Regions:
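Alpha-helical scaffold domains
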Residues: 1-228
Length: 228
C-alpha cells in the first residue's frame, strides 16, 4: 500500500526551485509554500511508475497539502481504465480542487466511452457552485462535445452561468472562442445578441482573434462586435 508520505517524498525528490518560483507566479491563488516545484513531465512519469501500486488510501486522503499532490491526483484519475472507478474518484476529488492547474490537467478519456452518461455528468458539474467543478465541466464539454457530438443547445450550458470568478469567466471565454472556431454559425449569435457578460464577451473575442483557426474575415467581423 502506497502512503501519502511515500508519494510526498517522491515528489520532494523531483523538486526544482527555479520552476517552483516560475509556477507560483502562474498560480497566484496557491500559497508559494504549498508549491513543491515539480514539472508536469516529471509528474506524468511518476504517475506511470505508480500504476502498479495500490493508491486507494492516498486517493481518499483528501485534502492534499501540496499543489503537485493535487495535480498528480488529477493525472492518476485521467489515466484510469474503469469508467466506474474513474467517475467515483473524480466525484470524490472535484470538491477539493482549488486551482486551475490541477483542474485543467484532468482529461478522463474513459468517461467518453459512454457519451450519454458523460454528458449528464458534465451538465451537473457545470451547474455546481464550486468554481473548479464548474470549470472542469465546461472544459469537458469543450473537449468532447463541440465536434461530431455537437448540439446547439450545449452552448446554453456555459452561457447561463453567471459568476464574478475570474477563472470561471476565463473558462467561459475559452469555451466560446473554441466554439467559434468549430461551430461558428451557432456560436457567433451569442456575441451578436450580447448573451455573455461584457468582460467575458470581450475576452472571447480576444481569444478568438488570437486563434489560427479563425479566418481573417471572421476576425475582422469579431472586432466589430467588441463592446466599448
Amino acid at each position: 500500500m502506497t502512503t501519502a508520505e511515500d508519494i510526498r517524498n517522491r515528489l520532494m525528490d523531483l523538486k526544482d526551485e527555479e520552476y517552483k518560483a516560475f509556477n507560483s507566479k502562474l498560480i497566484p491563488n496557491v500559497d508559494e509554500s504549498l508549491v513543491i516545484g515539480v514539472r508536469v513531465p516529471a509528474l506524468r512519469k511518476l504517475e506511470k511508475e505508480l500504476r502498479t501500486e495500490d493508491l486507494g488510501d492516498w486517493l481518499s486522503d483528501l485534502p492534499h497539502k501540496y499543489l503537485e499532490e493535487n495535480t498528480l491526483h488529477g493525472i492518476v484519475i485521467s489515466n484510469m481504465k474503469s469508467q466506474e472507478d474513474c467517475l467515483f474518484r473524480l466525484e470524490e476529488f472535484l470538491p477539493y480542487i482549488d486551482n486551475w492547474a490541477s483542474c485543467d490537467i484532468m482529461n478522463p478519456k474513459v468517461l467518453a466511452k459512454d457519451k450519454e452518461r458523460f454528458l449528464a455528468c458534465i451538465k451537473s458539474w457545470i451547474k455546481s457552485k464550486h468554481l473548479y467543478t464548474s470549470r472542469f465541466g465546461m472544459e469537458m464539454l469543450m473537449s468532447y462535445f463541440l465536434d461530431d457530438e455537437f448540439k446547439v443547445e450545449y452552448l446554453e450550458l456555459p452561457a447561463t452561468v453567471k459568476s464574478e470568478e475570474y477563472y470561471l469567466n476565463m473558462m467561459i471565454a475559452w469555451f466560446f472562442a473554441t466554439a467559434l472556431a468549430k461551430q461558428w454559425e451557432s456560436a457567433i449569435t451569442y456575441l451578436e445578441d450580447n448573451r455573455l457578460s461584457k468582460w467575458t464577451h470581450n475576452k472571447t473575442i480576444q481569444k478568438a482573434i488570437e486563434s489560427y483557426r479563425i479566418s481573417p474575415e471572421q476576425k475582422e467581423y469579431l472586432r466589430g462586435l467588441k463592446i466599448k
